[in-house]
């Protein structure tokens, strides 16, 4: 070759080397790919707007895009590179999404033997995990493959000759503004920025939404030696694949450099727009109407079920004969304003009591729970029978309502509440002797009616001050028939079990059962309670004063019976008060046969006849004995104290409460 030609060839070769060196040093930057020097294969293509689409929504497909010129890694120079790209994964409507995208370096642009699906178009079953592959990749994976030990279906991973990542992390970015990591959904369809920096020893990977600066903290930072993976001549590019589920994989822009310092920034404003598939308007409208219809139907069914359950009741065939005495739960719920606390009147062993208002009058609604069906028919029959009782000194019981697990009893509302509120809770006005005597006469008249004048004999079995209600005129009315039992006149009652309240219970209850004389005993205790202003049992007082019956008798023995009266009654009619105290002792005689019946009691209170001649030392007067349970020797009493304990039963529909 002529010397002149040699010189020309040397100059051309030198200039070419300078060009290649400059190209390798400075790298490239594409804000869209209209003029991008890319090689694409598979289903990958550059769209007219400059958007690189690696895959469309076809199934079982793969697509690659390479920078045409290979990267030359000189062993004498540090093995380093940096890249910044923007990608987006857009799902097909109604599809959960396909596989992901990988940024990678490969010794060849020929990946025709690579598989789609979970292999991301980089490997196949043979080349995966093969050191001879010499493929380094950063995967943005949206499918969790157990085969590759993926951590989840939305992660970033570092892959070296295998899709089993050497390190991975859930897709997220560090928010410098808030100082914490925020998750990113790779399949959201939004554009995502990715930075990959390798300085020869440490690999850093960062993510961020479009429009946010590169985070100060990397998502993944790992010390790595890539000298055995990256060969002298490598191609750089992107790969994506679809399986049975498919979506569009897009690259909007890409900047690459062998040096982090010389990496050019992408111009976000020049990036192409990502198309999002739109449903047809008619189909969207139809689906919207269907969804709205389903929501409306669910709301209507829910409202119906709520309303039905809210007012649901339990009704059985045998209850038809008691229909006039039954209230609907809905009417009681509305009458009490949903059992609002403002109408709460009190709470006792039977349950809670609320004031209610019906169109005709005010009512009191007592609600309490029940379990089981034993004796239910008898219980409701007795409620209906009590609704037929008619006496001015009985609280009128209007009827009932029955729900699953709950009873409601409806009675007339008593404005002044119960007698015990005035005796023991300083409720005003203070009860004068004339009012107290009038209350006792009224209750005595009511018991006389129950025992002798009603269609059946009615045993109340729970006479006490808290069950005596007062109307606006302080007329006493006996209420709370939850323990009441009925039997025909002349028949022997068959009640069993000692039920009631300590101090009001006749000592013969457990051995002989309830009778009219046990009601008389309880009324005698009530007489002493009203006259003395003390409860029948006061365990906190000195032992000689704890039992009211015994203490009143002791006062009489000391010839100071009047000292037992309520101190609030000083100056009242002493002879009349003493007579009433003696009547209380007579009614609480230990021997049932020695107690008067209620006919006599009414006559004594009305002073139609005089009390029989007896003294505090007469048999059975002022004597209190413990109550035996079931006729056994088990005494419901503490031996060191004369105070008998309270015995109570919940309602068991026919066997007591």
UniProtKB/Swiss-Prot annotation:
Catalytic activity: L-seryl-[protein] + ATP = O-phospho-L-seryl-[protein] + ADP + H(+); L-threonyl-[protein] + ATP = O-phospho-L-threonyl-[protein] + ADP + H(+)
Record-level GO cellular component terms: plasma membrane
Region (Legume-lectin like): 25-257
EC primary class: transferase
Residue numbers on the Cytoplasmic membrane side: 304-657
Main location: membrane
Gene null: resulting phenotype: Increased susceptibility to the fungus Alternaria brassicicola.
Pfam (any one): Lectin_legB
Membrane-protein topology: Single-pass type I membrane protein
Signal peptide: 1-23
Subcellular location: Cell membrane
Swiss-Prot/TrEMBL keywords: ATP-binding, Cell membrane, Glycoprotein, Kinase, Lectin, Membrane, Nucleotide-binding, Plant defense, Receptor, Serine/threonine-protein kinase, Signal, Transferase, Transmembrane, Transmembrane helix
Residues passing through the membrane, by range: 283-303
Superkingdom assignment: Eukaryota
Matching Gene3D superfamilies: 2.60.120.200, Phosphorylase Kinase, domain 1 (3.30.200.20), Transferase(Phosphotransferase) domain 1 (1.10.510.10)
Similarity comment text for this entry: In the C-terminal section; belongs to the protein kinase superfamily. Ser/Thr protein kinase family. In the N-terminal section; belongs to the leguminous lectin family.
Entry protein name: L-type lectin-domain containing receptor kinase I.8
Source organism of the structure: Arabidopsis thaliana
Gene: LECRK18
């Amino acid at each position: 070759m002529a010397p002149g030609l040699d010189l020309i060839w040397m100059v051309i070769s030198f200039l070419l080397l300078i060009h290649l060196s400059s190209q390798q040093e400075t790298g490239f930057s594409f804000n869209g790919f209209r003029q991008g020097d890319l090689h694409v294969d598979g289903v990958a293509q550059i769209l007219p707007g400059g958007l690189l689409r690696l895959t469309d929504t076809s199934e079982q497909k793969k697509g690659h895009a390479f920078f045409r010129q290979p990267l030359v890694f000189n062993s004498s120079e540090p093995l380093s590179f940096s890249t910044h790209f923007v990608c987006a994964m857009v799902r097909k409507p109604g599809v959960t999404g396909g596989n992901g995208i990988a940024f990678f370096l490969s010794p060849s642009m020929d990946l025709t033997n690579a598989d789609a699906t979970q292999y991301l178009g980089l490997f196949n079953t043979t080349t995966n995990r093969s050191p001879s592959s010499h493929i380094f990749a950063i995967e943005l994976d949206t499918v969790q493959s157990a085969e590759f030990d993926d951590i989840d279906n939305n992660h970033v991973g570092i892959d070296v000759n295998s899709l089993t990542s050497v390190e991975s992390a859930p897709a997220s970015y560090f928010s410098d503004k808030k100082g914490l990591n925020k998750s990113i959904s790779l399949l959201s369809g939004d554009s995502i920025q990715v930075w990959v920096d390798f300085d020869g020893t440490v690999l850093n990977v960062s993510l961020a939404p479009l429009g946010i600066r590169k985070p100060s903290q990397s998502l993944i930072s790992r010390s790595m030696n890539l000298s055995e993976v990256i060969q002298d001549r490598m191609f750089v590019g992107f790969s994506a694949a679809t399986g049975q589920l498919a979506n569009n994989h897009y690259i909007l822009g890409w900047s690459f450099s062998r040096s982090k310092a010389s990496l050019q920034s992408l111009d976000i404003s020049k990036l192409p727009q990502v198309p999002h598939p739109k449903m047809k308007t008619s189909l969207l409208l139809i689906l919207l109407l269907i969804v709205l219809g389903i929501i409306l139907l669910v709301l209507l069914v829910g409202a119906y079920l709520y309303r039905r359950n809210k007012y649901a009741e339990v009704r059985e065939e045998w209850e038809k004969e008691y229909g006039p005495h039954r209230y609907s739960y809905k009417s009681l719920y509305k009458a009490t304003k949903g059992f609002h606390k403002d109408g709460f009147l009190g709470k006792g062993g039977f349950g809670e009591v609320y004031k209610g208002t019906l169109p005709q009058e005010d009512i009191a609604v007592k609600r309490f729970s029940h379990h089981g069906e034993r004796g239910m028919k008898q219980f409701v029959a007795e409620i209906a029978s009590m609704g037929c009782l008619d006496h001015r000194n009985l609280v009128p019981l209007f009827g009932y309502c029955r729900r699953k697990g709950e009873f409601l009893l409806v009675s007339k509302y008593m404005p002044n509440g119960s007698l015990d509120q005035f005796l023991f809770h300083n409720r005003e006005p203070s009860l004068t002797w004339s009012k107290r005597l009038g209350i006792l006469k009224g209750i005595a008249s009511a018991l006389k009616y129950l025992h002798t004048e009603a269609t059946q004999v009615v045993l109340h079995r729970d006479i006490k001050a808290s069950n005596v209600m007062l109307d606006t005129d302080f007329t006493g009315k006996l209420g709370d028939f939850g323990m009441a039992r009925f039997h025909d006149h002349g028949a022997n009652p068959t009640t069993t079990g000692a039920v009631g309240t300590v101090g009001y219970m006749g000592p013969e209850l457990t051995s002989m059962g309830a009778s009219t004389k046990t009601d008389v005993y309880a009324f005698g205790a009530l007489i002493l309670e009203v006259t003395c202003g003390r409860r029948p049992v006061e365990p906190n007082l000195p032992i000689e004063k704890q039992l009211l019956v015994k203490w009143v008798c002791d006062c009489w023995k000391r010839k100071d019976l009047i000292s037992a009266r309520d101190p609030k009654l000083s100056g009242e009619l002493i002879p009349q008060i003493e007579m009433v105290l003696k009547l209380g002792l007579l009614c609480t005689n230990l021997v049932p046969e020695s107690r008067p019946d209620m006919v006599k009691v009414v006559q004594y209170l009305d002073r139609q006849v005089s009390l029989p001649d007896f003294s505090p030392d007469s048999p059975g007067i002022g004597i209190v004995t413990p109550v035996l349970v079931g006729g056994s020797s088990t005494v419901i009493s503490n031996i060191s104290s004369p105070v008998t304990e309270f015995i109570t039963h919940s309602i068991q529909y026919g066997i007591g409460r």
